[in-house]
Amino acid sequence: MSSETLKFARELISRPSITPEDEGCQQLIGERLAAQGFNLESMIFEDTTNLWARRGQGRKLFCFAGHTDVVPPGDINDWQFPPFEPTTHEGYLYGRGAADMKGSLAAMITATERFIKDYPNVDADIGFLITSDEEGPFINGTKRVIETLQERNENIDWCIVGEPSSTDTLGDIVKNGRRGSLTGDLTVLGIQGHVAYPHLAKNPVHDLAPALSELINEEWDQGNASFPPTTFQVSNIQAGTGAGNVIPGRIDTQFNFRFSTELTAEKIKQRVEAILDKHSLKYHLQWKLNGPPFLTESGALVEAVQAAIEHECGFSTTLSTAGGTSDGRFIAPTGAQVIELGPVNATIHKVNECVKISDLDKLSDVYYRCLEKLLC
């Protein structure tokens, strides 16, 4: 099992599948799943390749979810080893996607192969939802697949997303939820003019400043037992022509909320717009909901994951909702229990991304135990 997980991880890493390209990764995965009796369905939406694979029909459905796409490697000269030539060195496997998340995909496959061999007649269905658009716009990937499944009443009951959830050692952290993400693109309009004649102009930077200060200092909520307080962060500001003697005619500001289950996107929008209106601004505001918050409470999936990590790693894991968003935000609203469980995330998206080789074996074992404890 050990060499098989490592071997398959290397095969996947060697494919330079930068978003939204898949570069044949899903074909490799599909071939192995087909050999285990899975029905394969390729769902291609515009530039994105997705794979929906299911073994069985009509019973409770457990699903592994993941992505074959990776972020660009940057300057390959900064890498110790070529990013798409998987290299083992001093106990680690190096390559783009080693931790995020081709190592997880390999572990999912080998765990499933072993589980089906040991329990060929288990009374449950197993599925795989794999996309090539997780690191990018996330428009034509998991979101579209879930919409398609919902249209034909295919419902996932339990889902493990293979995102690199661990912090210091494999299994120390699992994500049983994520904060919501809401982005606002705000344009405040003024009147352009000469800096020496401010009475003939209207400076939108000055107009926005008090309102922006209020937004920054607002206490949006106090969080709860599962989520930290909601945060507001300005990410981009652009104003002016570049000339030092011109009052700008507009200011463009982008900001983001990471919000808890104490709030909804609509409540945030109402509060932001009330503050802007109070300051009598002339503005345009566009919103983009990247995903609502979700939380998987204690239940069958959480308990199976906790027991599997205790069995294979020898310690109790910690449930967390910290960090960014993942494709779990598209799966959880359907009613599925969702957990993110994967390798250590210390090197993801970095030069010299790597995963501990022994963690690939252990992760496969943890996934196997999750299947066993949940479905048997």
Curated annotation (Swiss-Prot):
Binding, Zn(2+) 2: D100, E135, H349
Origin species: Idiomarina loihiensis (strain ATCC BAA-735 / DSM 15497 / L2-TR)
Entry superkingdom: Bacteria
One matching Pfam family: M20_dimer
Pathway where this protein functions: Amino-acid biosynthesis; L-lysine biosynthesis via DAP pathway; LL-2,6-diaminopimelate from (S)-tetrahydrodipicolinate (succinylase route): step 3/3
NCBIfam families in UniProt: dapE_proteo, PRK13009.1
Main function: Catalyzes the hydrolysis of N-succinyl-L,L-diaminopimelic acid (SDAP), forming succinate and LL-2,6-diaminopimelate (DAP), an intermediate involved in the bacterial biosynthesis of lysine and meso-diaminopimelic acid, an essential component of bacterial cell walls.
E.C. number: 3.5.1.18
Keywords: Amino-acid biosynthesis, Cobalt, Diaminopimelate biosynthesis, Hydrolase, Lysine biosynthesis, Metal-binding, Zinc
Catalytic activity as recorded in UniProt: N-succinyl-(2S,6S)-2,6-diaminopimelate + H2O = (2S,6S)-2,6-diaminopimelate + succinate
Cofactor note: Binds 2 Zn(2+) or Co(2+) ions per subunit.
Catalytic center residues: D69, E134 (proton acceptor)
HAMAP family: DapE
Protein name: Succinyl-diaminopimelate desuccinylase
Quaternary data: Homodimer.
PROSITE patterns reported in the protein's UniProt record: ARGE_DAPE_CPG2_2 (PS00759)
